[in-house]
UniProtKB/Swiss-Prot annotation:
It catalyses: alpha-D-glucosamine 6-phosphate + H2O = beta-D-fructose 6-phosphate + NH4(+). Allosterically activated by N-acetylglucosamine 6-phosphate (GlcNAc6P). It holds the Pfam family Glucosamine_iso. This is Glucosamine-6-phosphate deaminase. Catalyzes the reversible isomerization-deamination of glucosamine 6-phosphate (GlcN6P) to form fructose 6-phosphate (Fru6P) and ammonium ion. The keyword Hydrolase applies. Homohexamer.
Length: 267
């Protein structure tokens, strides 16, 4: 696993966006051979999306032959709802780049048959061979996508009940009213994420420090699903200084020395 310890969340966003652009451009996607990108929602990736839009507008990347798969979507929330992940993605990213609408894939949380929708999503991913790069964030309790604590590390796309911690955290998007937050979501599984060729997690802020510690220094266990990244051949964690507060000093120093070139690229 690579850990890239930066100073600020802005540096994290810049590094992540540039890494995505480099991967797309190196791949040289075409209509018959698209680059497949996994994407998250939430507050952490917002600046990364803004930076990707800036790089697109500067002519440094095209998303015309990029296929995207989002991590998750609430159950029962209309697509047009201001807090649906459909709305989030179009408002904060898709409406500002040259991605083709047919290349956008987001789970349908309003379908009558959730199991069938989850199977369809898995098959759609498989139809492209694999996701080349999956970017994600992490919850305070270490969940990735909506794979809450005690989720199976071998899980696939499915419906999940959201924990009280997640409902409280997400209530900030629903007028701070926990009763307005959907109780269920469709989400890719931990194994779905690990199937990607590369997984890049963005971890920022003091409140994510325990999650980062579990990811980097802890044992692999289902109570901290982020720890499953240790099993991946090409896992990357990009973090800011506040998120490192629970890591051992020698751990931070080790990766700081190891990733000197990556760190200097955003200074």
């Amino acid at each position: 696993m690579r850990l890239i310890p930066l100073q600020t969340s802005e540096q994290v966003s810049r590094w992540a966006a540039r890494h995505i652009v480099e991967r797309i451009n190196r791949f040289q996607p075409t209509a018959d051979r698209p680059f497949v990108l996994g994407l998250p929602t939430g507050g952490t990736p917002l600046q990364t999306y803004k930076e990707l839009i800036r790089l697109y507008q500067a002519g440094e990347v095209s998303f015309q032959h990029v296929v995207t798969f989002n991590m998750d979507e609430y159950v029962g929330l209309p697509k047009e709802h201001p807090q649906s992940y459909h709305t989030f993605m179009y408002r904060n990213f898709f409406d500002h780049i040259d991605i083709q609408p047919q290349n956008i894939n987001i789970l349908n949380g309003n379908t009558e048959d959730h199991d069938a929708e989850c199977r369809r999503y898995e098959e759609k991913i498989k139809s492209y061979g694999k996701i080349h790069l999956f970017m994600g964030g992490v919850g305070v309790d270490g969940h990735i996508a909506f794979n809450e604590p005690a989720s199976s590390l071998g899980s696939r796309t499915r419906i999940k009940t959201l924990t009280e911690d997640t409902l409280i955290a997400n209530s900030r998007f629903f007028d701070n009213d926990i009763t307005k937050v959907p109780k269920y979501a469709l989400t890719v599984g931990v194994a779905t994420l690990l199937d990607a060729e590369e997984v890049m997690l963005l971890i920022t802020g003091y409140n994510k420090a325990l999650a980062l510690q579990a990811c980097v220094e802890g044992s692999v266990n289902h109570m901290w699903t982020v720890s499953a990244l240790q099993l991946h051949k090409r896992g990357i964690v990009v973090c800011d200084e506040p998120a490192t507060q629970e890591l051992k000093v020698k751990t931070v120093k080790y990766f700081t020395q190891l990733e000197t070139q990556a760190i200097q690229s955003v200074l």
